[in-house]
Amino acid sequence: MPQIVVAALYKFVSLPDYQELQPGLLALCNAQGIKGTLLLAEEGINGTVAGSRAAIDALLTYLRQDSRMVDIDHKESFADEMPFYRMKVRLKKEIVTLGVPGISPNKKVGTYVKPEDWNTLISDPDVVVIDTRNNYEYEIGTFKGAIDPATTTFRQFPEFVRKNLDPAKNKKVAMFCTGGIRCEKASSYMLEQGFKEVYHLQGGILKYLETIPEEESLWEGECFVFDQRVAVKHGLQVGDYDQCFACRHPISAADMASSKYVKGISCPRCYDRMSAEKRARIAERQRQIEIARQRGEEHIGDNARQYSLIHKLSKTKKILPKT
């Protein structure tokens, strides 16, 4: 069976007509059997999708026919199975949510650093290296010596900067993220705050892991990705982590050996924080998934939106979801 191509792509570019782009883009992806999520906003496009080699090539060709996206950045990795359940093209205020008005990499952005030059930069003792990802991403892997902002969402990054960094003291700042989009927007924010030398890893961690040999790498651990692969290693090989359905955090083999781990229901991180009602609701959903799997049906996918609605109604009416 041919491998599935997983393409992470984004571009900050002025798209005042972004709403008009949605129908055609969704139709193309559906026709090609592509699954994943694409975000459209006035500031650009962002997303990760998966499909056959021909399908992904067709999507990239379609996007690059628009002169504004002719040089859209994309990174590829591979999976043995489709890592997404359905295709979504969403309209958003921001393609990556910082929550600070007026911040635009289309107007001001930091210095891009190629993976080949990254080790030299972050080995400089005068450079402050910041991981702009969330805490659960940092926990399973990061660059040696990188600062963890301990954020749970990208919206919290400006507060971290305000409390912990000073343009007068931190002369050189280097940032990185999964694919490059968060650190690119963060660099725009940092420049607006008065920082002068702001660098960010071009192509993100994924490009670094693809490009730099493991024996030369300063990366430690695995890189969390937002699909069913959960994490990737050097060479973009699928990592060793799984994911807890309940809290969505990556879980290790040690976590799965815990008495608090129940497949599809809980893990050591969320077990003690989960109400009995929620645990019962998740257990019922897992039961339905297993039934569908035994019947050879897709419980999640085309019917996911319907399930989501039922799930929301069940929370309102205090009943268990039914499918």
UniProtKB/Swiss-Prot annotation:
What's any GO biological process attached to this entry? tRNA modification
Q: Where is the active site?
A: C177
Q: Which domain of life is it from?
A: Bacteria
Q: What is its EC number?
A: 1.14.-.-
* Reactions accelerated catalytically: uridine(34) in tRNA + AH2 + O2 = 5-hydroxyuridine(34) in tRNA + A + H2O
Q: What keywords tag this UniProt record? A: Oxidoreductase, tRNA processing
Positions in coiled-coil regions: none
* InterPro entries assigned to the protein according to its UniProt record, in alphabetical order: Rhodanese-like_dom, Rhodanese-like_dom_sf, TrhO, TRHO_N
Gene3D superfamilies in alphabetical order: 3.30.70.100, Rhodanese-like domain
Q: Which residues form the Rhodanese domain?
A: 123-217
Q: Which SUPFAM superfamilies match?
A: Rhodanese/Cell cycle control phosphatase
- Name a GO molecular-function annotation: oxidoreductase activity, acting on paired donors, with incorporation or reduction of molecular oxygen
What Pfam families does the annotation carry? Rhodanese, UPF0176_N
Which NCBIfam families does this chain map to? PRK00142.1-4
What is this protein's function per UniProt? Catalyzes oxygen-dependent 5-hydroxyuridine (ho5U) modification at position 34 in tRNAs.
**Similarity-based family:** Belongs to the TrhO family.
Q: Which PANTHER family match?
A: RHODANESE-LIKE DOMAIN-CONTAINING PROTEIN 7-RELATED, THIOSULFATE SULFURTRANSFERASE/RHODANESE-LIKE DOMAIN-CONTAINING PROTEIN 2
Q: What is this protein called?
A: tRNA uridine(34) hydroxylase
Q: Which organism is it from?
A: Methylobacillus flagellatus (strain ATCC 51484 / DSM 6875 / VKM B-1610 / KT)
Lineage here is:
Bacteria, Pseudomonadati, Pseudomonadota, Betaproteobacteria, Nitrosomonadales
